Amino acid sequence: MELPVCFYEERLRQQETEIKSLAAEIERLKNCGFVSETPSLEGLREENAKLKYRLNILRKSLLEEKKKSSKSMININAQIQEIFGTAIGAAYPELQNAPLAVTPSQQPKFGDYQCNSAMAITQMLKAMNQKVSPREIADKIVKNIPTNELVEKVDIAGPGFINVHLHKDFTSKQISKLLVNGVQPPVIWERKKVVVDFSSPNIAKEMHVGHLRSTVIGDSICRLFEFVGHDVLRLNHLGDWGTQFGMLIAHLQDKFPDYLTVSPPIGDLQSFYKESKKRFDEDEEFKKRAYQCVVQLQNKTPNFIQAWNLICDVSRKEFQKIYDCLDISIIDRGESFYQDRMIGVVKEFEEKGLVQVDEGRKVVFPPGCSVPLTIVKSDGGFTYDTSDLAALKQRLQEEKADMIIYVIDSGQAIHMQNVFSAGRMIGWYDPKVTRIEHAGFGVVLGEDKKKFKTRSGDTVRLIDLLDEGLKRSMEKLKDKGRDKVLTAEELLAAQTSVAFGCIKYADLSHNRMNDYIFSFDKMLDDRGNTAAYLLYAYTRIRSIARLANISDEDLHKAAKETEIILEHEKEWKLSKCILRFPEILQKILDDLLLHTLCDYLYELATTFTEFYDNCYCVEKDRQTGQIVKVNMSRLLLCDATAAVMAKGFDILGIKPVQKM
């Protein structure tokens, strides 16, 4: 939850007070020159230097925070909550943790925001044997609202709903600030180290449609946390270790005996994997050799490590093709990275008396978990449980993570909760201090509402899905005649923007907790809540000023000089929608549900359409088509809308184009 602005301002005030105090202390120390012959003089000089150093640091910090605060977008909802929190505290000081319920109003007649706390406070007072109606409570809250620049007026409706009407002057100035400074993130109280574990395919297997969700959702979460200013580590927890590498190395030795000196031409690693698996299942001698290869690999025998690296490199190159298509940045850190750390993890659990032996296995029962974690198999080998525990410990203790987010399918929910619980039990982290969360997601379904498969029943390869998206998006653009008006370069840019944008948006626009139906026809439809509709809307908005011969430089200059007029109801509605962007982002930072951003962008686009249909931005002579009037205030509202949409697209990993 973002801290209210009052806390931030109080922090600045405290810093300013401390600066004055430190300055006075330095002055006092300067006046102590007469004690030069005493032994304490050197100590006083040292203290003086420390105070000066601290003073300079504080001044620099203060200037940076003021500069950042002045440019940042304001979370209006949070500020209204702060105002009403103050009012409720003044009206009912005896209440601890009084409920704060502030939401945007659904209808203009109920103002711009509503505070619905009175009903809940009635119940709290009733429990204290005080019988007061919600309307009386609302009235008392209203009388205690502090002076502020946001709220123009309030009125009480129904049983005790408080309708909040914003100052148009305040809203106008916030739009101007956005236009001058660009779309800036809301101020965060503390920059944190955030580790996001996502994508995570297995070496020697192709990425399939199931990897799409983790990859797209994880990337978008990273983009959001990066935008607001956190230090994000994007990790690809590759499946690059295990017994399957024994059969792959044995097959490599047979098929490419000179692999140590000549790079083997493994064109299709999936087929290579299937061939080795077939031999492993059918040939006992091959199976024995495969197990021997596993032992050699675990002992880190150089030739076997080289073979393992060759196989991993082939896979990584194939994965990178997909990451390049989807514009995904990620650091590979597979299970192999944690192998040497697993021994220490097992030892730590044993030393703390947390290990039980079950049929030769070493298991751990985390609190509240009925299924144990197996940290050592009966044959002495480690498991995925051991690997995940080692990864958790490394991220907490070596990476110093303040937050770890695992973007893994919901089928792993019990396993992830067991791992987290074990981490708490052994004392690696305190959930009150460190946020560790499983951002689970449902499966991708075909239009038959069954798991998405090819006609032959195979899992859909992700690269094939992306290629099909490119093909269909080009067909869609040609159906609209865009190949006749766009240059070859513009057409190619539009094709990739629509193809990959639609695939990502179709996923992100659904609540990640639910399964979703994959349909190219629906995602490429330019009507409704789709990327196609939003991308077309964006290019249309961007073209308004261009067709009026107004350059970006003209708009930027006008933003500093032009007052934003919000007299028409559609101007007012659009401005409020634009300024809700920070509160939308804050909600997603809290719950990691990205469909909220998609819903907001769709609402913004449809609200803009209402505005554009009712408010002339550029007036032309009906006979000649010549421009007779440009409403710069409205053009700036267009520009602000496009700027917020562009930043929303960026967080979703979608690349809009200027022409489509």
Swiss-Prot record:
Parts forming coiled coils: none
Location comes to: Cytoplasm; Cytoplasm, Cytosol
Q: In which broad location class does this protein mainly occur, judging by the first location in its UniProt entry?
A: cytoplasm
Q: Which SMART domains match?
A: Arg_tRNA_synt_N, DALR_1
Q: What SUPFAM superfamilies does UniProt report for this protein, alphabetically?
A: Anticodon-binding domain of a subclass of class I aminoacyl-tRNA synthetases, Arginyl-tRNA synthetase (ArgRS), N-terminal 'additional' domain, Nucleotidylyl transferase
**UniProt key word Mitochondrion:** no
The protein's annotated catalytic reaction(s) are: tRNA(Arg) + L-arginine + ATP = L-arginyl-tRNA(Arg) + AMP + diphosphate
Q: Which GO terms describe its biological process?
A: arginyl-tRNA aminoacylation
Q: Does the keyword Protein biosynthesis apply?
A: yes
Q: What is its EC number?
A: 6.1.1.19
Q: Which residues bind L-arginine?
A: 200-202, 211, 384, 388, 412
Motif 'HIGH' region, per the record, lies over 201-212
Q: What's this protein's family per the entry?
A: Belongs to the class-I aminoacyl-tRNA synthetase family.
Q: How does it assemble?
A: Monomer; also part of a multisubunit complex that groups tRNA ligases for Arg, Asp, Glu, Gln, Ile, Leu, Lys, Met and Pro.
Q: What is this protein called?
A: Arginine--tRNA ligase, cytoplasmic
State the organism named in the record. Answer: Xenopus tropicalis
Upper lineage: Eukaryota, Metazoa, Chordata, Craniata, Vertebrata
